[in-house]
Amino acid sequence: LDTYYGLKEGRISRADFAPTVYLFGAKAAPGYVRAKGIIKYINELAELVNGDADVNGLMQVVFVQNYNVSYAEKIIPAADVSEQISTAGTEASGTSNMKFMLNGAVTLGTLDGANIEIAEQAGAENEYIFGARADEIARLQKDGYDPNAVLAAEPRAKRVVESLVDGTFSDGGTGMFRELYVSLTEGASWHKPDHYFLMRDFIEYCDAGCQPGLSRRAGFRGKVCAQCGKRRRVFVRPYDSGICAGHLARVNAWDKAKRHGAKVPCRFFMPSASARAWCG
């Protein structure tokens, strides 16, 4: 939503922004009301963005229902950027980021879980790292943290959060969006306000997320190759260089297609697994 506003208002350069399709894939347990609220919000956002002729040539949003292995087998090999955005110190590890990395995807994420090892092996300069580190999160938990102070200081964050309750989107009268809003600003159940420190990382996350979409394609190729080199060091699979060549071929094809006016790349986001990918 912040990117949508940025494009609409000129804060994000349309000339530098790569046309992007955001694919969200998730599923919610029958009684998981908050997860259902997030999915509803994604679909409302899709309706807003896709129905706006002013921006839908630059960005679109699609929700993939019941995301599963069959979808992953198609999406993961195509990914250019894998988002792994769990709050630092909250996720022991995961395998999604490894699967994306094994297919040449650059990681955009926090220093958490296996992201740390990926950054160490491929080089932090070849990833898009943002957000508070685990020691800062621990300090905020100890000394106190006020997300409302962050919202007061960051109009962009406030505008996005307020969209939950200001009429921008409708939850059909279920109250799910207000529950999400309350969880961020007042606290819900046994959690304090913004339990996962989302507002602390919000602006850094949005700004980091725009970097892969800028017109620095040559630099991005180098980052992709670094992921492939990491695979050879860790797994000793000599044929991985062929995968890298195929991935770079997709990047080159994207460049050629873009020169001819094609609208090609897409991003994939799994909220339940804290992962998003930008597919070319």
For each of these PLM feature ranges, what is it?
Residues 1-5, 43, 47, 80, ...:
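Amphipathic, well-packed alpha-helical segments that form the structural scaffold of globular domains
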Residues 77-79, 85-256:
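Catalytic binding pocket for nucleotide-activated donors in carbohydrate/polymer assembly enzymes
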Residues 60-62, 84-87:
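Short, flexible loop segments at the rims of nucleotide/cofactor-binding pockets, characterized by
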Residues 1-73:
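Long, K/E/R/D-enriched contiguous segments that form extended
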Residues 272-274:
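Serine residues within intrinsically disordered or low-complexity segments
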